[in-house]
Amino acid sequence: MTLELFNQEFEGIVGQLKSYLLRITASIADAEDIVQDTYIKAQEKLSTFREESSLKTWLFTIASNLAKDNLRVQKRWVENVTDITKAAALSNKKFFEEAMHIRTTSPQGQFEIKEHIAFCFTCISKSLPLEQQLCIFLKEVYEFKVSEITTILNTTEAMVKYYLHTGRTKMINVFEGRCALINKEGVCHQCSELNGIFNPKQKAQEEVMKIEMAQEAEKGDKEHLFDLRMAILREIDPFKSKASELQLHHLEHNRQLMDNYLEKTSI
Amino acid sequence: MATTVKTTFSRETSVSADIKADAAIVWALLTKASDYPRWNSTVTSLEGNIALGETIKLKSILDAKRTFKLKVKEFEPEKKLVWGDGQGNRVYTITKNGNGAVKFSMVEKIGGLMFPMYAKMIPPFDQSFDQFASDLKKESETIMNSK
């Protein structure tokens, strides 16, 4: 592959690569750094690229290997991350002032429940063991085949299936217990609550019912509801969406809090 | 079906199952402690790191109030896992049969000179062994057949 063709194809893949890295680092700066390092490494090794896999698979392999060395990728959060960060945000006037400023001034400062669903998944998925988190994103969001994930993560098909199954099952159970969009008894209403703050003229329940996952909730098919949640993530580019600036601000807030929380609770 | 062989000073229960799944999947399920209660209906909690020399804490449906502290004595990836205490050992073995399936077996022998004194206080293992093997087979094959 020539450098010119590589650069051209890289442009088409870089958006997905960057969003993948953001979702596993929860850090804008780290995601951007790893994208740059991936480009440099890929360019250096271009002569070794035999096109046995697609360029997208090859780039995700390089990026995943670089990401595994990143401390923020290695750090595992806790399942109730959104409870911890909500409590902190409520006592942080500056956070809401900044968020409201973004909401009123930025073209990418809209609040949409769907975008918050994607953001929420990013945060909670960091409580999974790393391999499970990576497999879920690669398969369900970036639509790699199991055989391609074996290349990206340098593991066997059996283990990819194991990570996918255990990760999916864990996340299904977490959301079933927490998410009020799919379970009336769910303890977390943050997306509707934030919609009330950022879009006070909207009726939150009406907004919720525009989302297919919420419409399908009563049928109780947990696997299907998880697939619908993944479909929401696939639709959203966290760097380019209408709510990206607001959600990135929120993500930075959560990451900093979790960095401190994990430091305090580590033995 | 599980079988038990009793002698004056020991009791040995064993069960085996043919599992149509990769040995790596069976091994991963057997060695991820915190995941046990999700797929294994005989284990209510399992804490610790299943690795050679580590101590784990097991709670089982056989005696919900008791926590068994067990040491991991052998750890041969995708082949053999042994944990136990002073009263006995549980041995798990996985044998690849060449066509992508494995034979899983689980044996627990308890005993010693004092065994006759407490033998009657230990409930039979047969049913929970059958359940364990059946749960492992079901979960392994579900994972193997996933797309």
Predicted regions and their residues:
Chain A
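A short, charge-rich alpha-helical start-of-domain segment used by transcription regulators
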Residues: 1-19, 32
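Intrinsic, short, N-terminal disordered tails of RNA polymerase sigma-factor systems
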Residues: 4, 8, 79-130, 147-154, ...
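The N-cap/first-turn positions of alpha helices
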Residues: 14, 131-132
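Short, small-hydrophobic-rich alpha-helical interface motif
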Residues: 17, 21, 31-42, 62, ...
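Short amphipathic helical patch at the helix-1/turn junction of helix-turn-helix
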Residues: 22, 139-141
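Σ70-family region 2.3-2.4 aromatic/basic alpha-helix that recognizes the −10 promoter
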Residues: 39-43, 53-82, 164, 168
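A short pre-motif secondary-structure segment
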Residues: 135-136
